[in-house]
Amino acid sequence: MKNKKRVLIASSLSCAILLLSAATTQANSAHKDSQDQNKKEHVDKSQQKEKRNVTNKDKNSTVPDDIGKNGKITKRTETVYDEKTNILQNLQFDFIDDPTYDKNVLLVKKQGSIHSNLKFESHKEEKNSNWLKYPSEYHVDFQVKRNPKTEILDQLPKNKISTAKVDSTFSYSSGGKFDSTKGIGRTSSNSYSKTISYNQQNYDTIASGKNNNWHVHWSVIANDLKYGGEVKNRNDELLFYRNTRIATVENPELSFASKYRYPALVRSGFNPEFLTYLSNEKSNEKTQFEVTYTRNQDILKNRPGIHYAPPILEKNKEGQRLIVTYEVDWKNKTVKVVDKYSDNKSFREG
């Protein structure tokens, strides 16, 4: 009887210990979960605060920079999208306040997107009824509107660039000194730098030979286009060509190589990053700039089905452009859009 009582007491004691242990574990787990949740909320709030600060700083800000003891940078951004042409202009205006220089200084970075507007079309009235319209050229044009007191002193990129990726850095030092180098990174100490970086695989960037102190133009033009196992020049009428019995007038896309193999600038579009450095006489309070983004399209015309008829190539046959006029207030360091216009014109040299 005594042994049975001892076993019962021991069993009750073990159950009590197990229950106490489980309760302690659950309490610790709940406390840890609470700590983790508090930590997560703290991190999330910190990240949100940091994100808000970065966003606000990027949009409109005045921040000190290494351009001298009392130098500072005021940043403005203007964005304009045109639905009809599917072109977006995003311009960054960096006003450099340099007390050691007797002129206003401005860096304008031209960004945004020019969508490819790649299209397959059917034109039953023609023998070569299956058409492919693709972006053979992209153009960015920047000019000072009728104001001799504001001048363009430098630009990026310069000359002709054929590499798949373009990277360059512009550097400004106190006293109005400036420099530019290939690659990303500061070019010297005690300077303010701005970089450009964009992809142009199978295309070339060409800075127009007619550039002057009030006008600069960049052309990004298709060269040798690679798709799948093929490599063909833009001037080759057999570019993207496909001769197959399954192609019909109702399915023009089947007369050409699969679009998923096309280079990114053909398939999706182009994201420009071009830079202009300007100076302005302090007696001049306002200046207007006209910025034009243009997409030129070549048309390839194929006859559906198995045949021996040659394809037809028509260069720069169509185009779309977005023209925006911006006004800079030098005294208040502000920018506003004063005019916007778009049409279906391609860029023509001359």
Swiss-Prot record:
GO terms for cellular component: extracellular region. Residues 28-71 are annotated as: Disordered. Residues 1-27 form the signal peptide. One of its GO terms (biological process) is cytolysis in another organism. InterPro entries: Bi-component_toxin_staph, Leukocidin/Hemolysin_toxin, Leukocidin/porin_MspA_sf. It comes from the Bacteria. Keywords: Signal. It holds the Pfam family Leukocidin. Residues 30-60 have a biased composition (Basic and acidic residues). The keyword Signal applies. Transmembrane segments: none annotated. The keyword Signal applies. Belongs to the aerolysin family. This is Uncharacterized leukocidin-like protein 2.
